[in-house]
Regions:
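Bacterial carbohydrate/catabolite-sensing allosteric modules
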Residues: 3-184
Length: 184
């Protein structure tokens, strides 16, 4: 969502409900996920299960989800009084390819990593693909937590924990909000 698009919406003088893209200071209502909290809870779960060498396949730092999920990861370590290993934070681009390449790098250069937190479904698919190629079993050989649900993964019976953004629920809440706005 860029400024030109937001200005166009504002000038149209119609009710607008943004979904899943929290654009600050626009005056538009919206339904958003708390990226920071979701990443915090996912990372805390891994830490509580004995993992301390957790690699993060983060999104781009120029995106709200990328920054929020990275901060949630870092905050969970601080909350648990465990030092954050900054060298285990890798920037992906929300693509399958980046998830695969970063996972390959993690496996080659950081053998002490026991868990990976991947910050979106495409990068998680890339991570799964690389783990499968090298014969690593999830969760036996590598714990994996993803952000965004992956219904396809259930077909292969992976034990994968995900932060589910529930598009259906966000759409439902957005329609309730829009209905309320239209009723005045």
């Amino acid at each position: 969502v860029n400024n030109e698009y937001l200005n166009l919406l504002s000038n149209m003088k119609i009710p607008v409900v943004l979904v899943d893209r929290d654009v600050k200071y626009t005056g538009h209502a919206g339904v958003f996920i708390d990226n920071e909290y979701g990443a915090f809870e996912a990372t805390k779960l891994l830490l509580e299960n004995g993992h301390s060498n957790i690699a993060l396949i983060a999104g781009p730092t120029n995106t709200v989800p990328g920054r929020g999920r990275r901060k949630g990861y870092q905050d969970a370590f601080k909350f648990m009084n465990i030092p954050v290993r900054e060298e285990l934070i890798f920037n992906g681009d929300f693509s399958i390819t980046s998830g695969k390449l970063i996972t390959r790098h993690i496996l080659a250069d950081y053998p002490d990593v026991t868990a990976i937190f991947s910050c979106n479904n495409h990068m998680t698919l890339g991570c799964i693909s690389e783990l499968m190629e090298v014969g690593k079993k999830i969760p036996d050989d590598m714990a994996l937590v993803g952000f965004d649900d992956l219904p396809l993964v259930k077909i292969f019976h992976y034990q994968l924990t995900v932060v589910d953004r529930s598009s259906r629920e966000m759409g439902y809440q957005a329609m309730k909000l829009m209905s309320k706005m239209l009723k005045g």
